[in-house]
Amino acid sequence: MQNYDHLGQVFKNLRTNRHISLKQISNERVSAAQISRFERGESDISLEKFLIALSNMHIEVSEFMDAVNNYQRTEQICFMSALIPLEYERNIAGFQKMQAEEAWEFSEHPDIYRHHLNVILLQSFICKCDATVPFPEEYIDEVTDYLFTTEEWNMYELILIGNLYLFIDIPLLHRMGQEILKRKDYYWEIGSHKNLVTITLLNIWETCLHRDALTVALFYMEKIEPLLNDETDLYKRTIYLFLSGLLHYKQGEKQSGIEEMKNAIQIFEWVGSENLANNYKKDFERFVR
């Protein structure tokens, strides 16, 4: 069994939550000492002994695997939550500390590729804080290989694309965007995934505009519009208004494009989103001549 320290922790959580002692689940075929070492991640345990211990707790394998998956999701949510204040503070040292921790985890557990992907994800935050720091090309290759050999793209895969899009060339990024659109019916069943899909597609659209890939940008404008049918979703609809204005401006419809961009900035000001208003003012000044 791989990742036995991780599985051992889940096993221990299930046992202690049920107030079951090691003695109660041990017998002549699996000792309390063996189970204890497995729980602490100090040694592996054979599949036969593991199934005996699980059966002695009256837990089905499917129930255990549900707990494992939930543990992994919780672990990743904690990781992502730690990034938010660091990004707000532009705390490069904090990102580097987390990156070193993830690199160590991967060196200890090379079969848990998520730790290496977290190293790459953290590098993207460092590069966004300091534009002089290069983003290694091999990281893009590794992420691309990972994504296109992963059958289902869930929240983590969307987060990867949504944070690495600045470093991916347009043809490859467009390919990723098209894959997301193919799967959107699946994502639409889960509210958090639906929101992340829309934000990721808006990011792809924005970087296409910034890099003057107008044909691809028009593709995303047309695909994103029907996704924004909720009138209460002011944030994403306002970003859409600004980006559509920028596209129209770059296509030569300068006056209507300027009006759309100014209207979007004004909406952010009206609702008190000063940081967003200022960010889009900078974009406006950057592109409007």
Annotate each language-model stretch with its function.
Residues V10, K49, S81, H115-I126, ...:
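"A position-specific structural signal for the A-helix of alpha-solenoid helical repeats
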Residues E157-L234:
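Alpha-helical adaptor scaffolds
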Residues E87-E101, T132-D141, I170-K182, R211-E222, ...:
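Helix-turn-helix repeat elements of alpha-solenoid scaffolds
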Residues M1-N17:
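A short, Lys/Arg-rich alpha-helix, primarily the initiator
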Residues E48-E63:
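DNA major-groove recognition helix of helix-turn-helix/homeodomain DNA-binding modules
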Residues H19-R37:
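Short alpha-helical DNA-recognition segment
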Residues Q99-S107, D141-F148, L181-W188, M221-N229, ...:
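Amphipathic alpha-helical segments of tetratricopeptide repeats
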